[in-house]
Amino acid sequence: SVRSGARASMPGMMDTILNLGLNDEVAEGMVKKTGNPHFVYDSYRRFVQMYGDVVMGLKPVNKEDIDPFEAIIEKVKEEQGVTLDKDLSVESLKKLVELFKAAIKEQTGQDFPTNPIDQLWGAICAVFRSWMNERAILYRKMEGIPDEWGTAVSVMAMVFGNMGETSATGVCFSRDAGNGEDLFNGEYLINAQGEDVVAGIRTPQQITKIGSQRWAERAGISEEERVTKYPSMEEAMPEIYKELDALQTKLENHYRDMQDMEFTVQEGKLWFLQTRNGCLLYTSDAADD
């Protein structure tokens, strides 16, 4: 993955590239190594889409504009008769890779790069460029962050939340950001990657059981349906939840501030991707603690 590393945290303002390094040859090798072609080609189609959006300029400028990749995904899902991306077959995922590459060629006149080094430099330059995108400039003005600070770019080994039902990805907070209540909370998705949690493609599930019950009550969902379709991590992955809960407490105690954390679970193993001091709207409870 290729991520920004600005001096001051700018959540969601900068661009990120995941699954970098994939091409047809690497994909075949990963299938042999993992025995999981669905995971490999899901990662591959995600990479081509993200690279096309961020590096090659196909990301829609306005919300009203049609994302060419999303239009292709919807068409392929309709052809296969499924509603969720995660239910696409391996053949459909392979088809998406080729259709995405064709869309890039058609709209930019350039081929999708297959050399991993070319991919890497393209991604690094794109993340540096994103420092000056419209939303980042506006955010810095609001937060009083100087443009001259610039950003670093971090190149990190990937861990994968989309390797199956024992993998997941999520975001969590060590306390309630709205009122400072000492209540661990957050959202996660099984068999997904980071952007899925905030993209609205699937309904994220709650980290804690109490959070899940509160969410279901607000949404008018019965307890039976909640447990069946939207179980909390505390219920669906109890051992991972215990580890996550212990570590979020440790991180808040260490930094002496509310923590905003991102994590991935790869085949039953928990990995922290990032933690940063969160923004409390009301801090008296946190101050008392």
Region spans (language model):
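Nucleotide/phosphate-binding sheet-loop regions of phosphoryl- and nucleotidyl-transfer enzymes
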Residues: S1-S284
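A short, hydrophobic C-terminal helix/tail in secreted or cell-surface proteins
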Residues: D285-D289
